[in-house]
């Protein structure tokens, strides 16, 4: 019962939580803690930043190769992001969930989003925070795009929010010293939420594989998505 209650609490967040104070905290944390790591240890480069919408709701959807992906994405877009984190992370008794919750993240079942998830998304999109979702559901180290979680499409359609595919390119391990790694974040053109669910998934996979060189195991694979 305790774990179930904790997950429910972390999955439901309100518009009032994404206020100016949390926005300022996020950006200070980004500039003071995150950016020095991403730019000086991973020599982060950003391509396609002009593809970010100037206004309106949108979902940032990166591939997932490491636990550094949220920092890479936040540094690349230079904006506060409400990341969806897998519910298992909030079930663990470690300190990470306290920090990411403070930074605006919330718990989600990506395979079967709950009503609380849609209410949270609706509240977030009444602010100027974009949503961050990893369609793969967890980190993948086999250089293949496969087993995409369909929840991000369901959420995009319910929220009427376009999807911005983001490719994280070049990760081959964690940096231990300055200027050791080279990471490129490629921000792709928006994918309309109005497209068929299967087409959205195929477009996302194709964009990620084009930039990363990963094998597209979702090619021509149909996904049945209930919206």
Q: Which residues make up each language-model segment?
A:
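A transmembrane-helix-recognition feature enriched in membrane-embedded lipid enzymes
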Residues: 2-48, 72, 92-103
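Catalytic core of membrane glycerolipid acyltransferases/transacylases, capturing the structured
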Residues: 39, 54-112
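Short acidic-hydrophobic, aromatic-tinged amphipathic segments that line or gate anion-handling sites
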Residues: 46-47, 106-109, 193
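Glycine-rich, highly charged phosphate/nucleotide-binding loops
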Residues: 45, 112-118
């Amino acid at each position: 019962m305790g774990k179930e209650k904790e997950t429910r609490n972390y999955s439901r967040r309100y518009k009032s939580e994404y206020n100016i104070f949390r926005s300022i905290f996020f950006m200070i944390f980004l500039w003071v803690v995150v950016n020095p790591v991403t730019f000086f240890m991973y020599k982060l480069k950003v391509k396609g930043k002009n593809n970010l919408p100037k206004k309106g709701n949108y979902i940032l959807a990166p591939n997932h190769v490491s636990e550094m992906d949220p920092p890479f994405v936040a540094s690349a877009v230079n904006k506060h992001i409400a990341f969806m984190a897998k519910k298992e992370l909030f079930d663990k008794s470690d300190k990470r969930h306290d920090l990411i919750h403070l930074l605006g993240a919330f718990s989600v079942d990506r395979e079967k989003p709950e009503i609380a998830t849609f209410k949270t998304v609706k509240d977030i999109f009444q602010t100027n925070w974009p949503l961050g979702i990893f369609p793969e559901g967890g980190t993948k180290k086999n250089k293949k795009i496969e087993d995409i979680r369909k929840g991000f499409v369901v959420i995009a359609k319910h929220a009427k929010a376009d999807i911005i595919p983001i490719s994280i390119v070049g990760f081959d391990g964690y940096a231990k010293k300055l200027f050791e790694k080279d990471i490129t974040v490629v921000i792709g053109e928006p994918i309309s939420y109005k497209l068929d669910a299967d087409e959205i998934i195929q477009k996302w996979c194709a964009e990620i594989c084009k930039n990363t060189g990963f094998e597209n195991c979702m090619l021509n694979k149909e996904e049945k998505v209930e919206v």
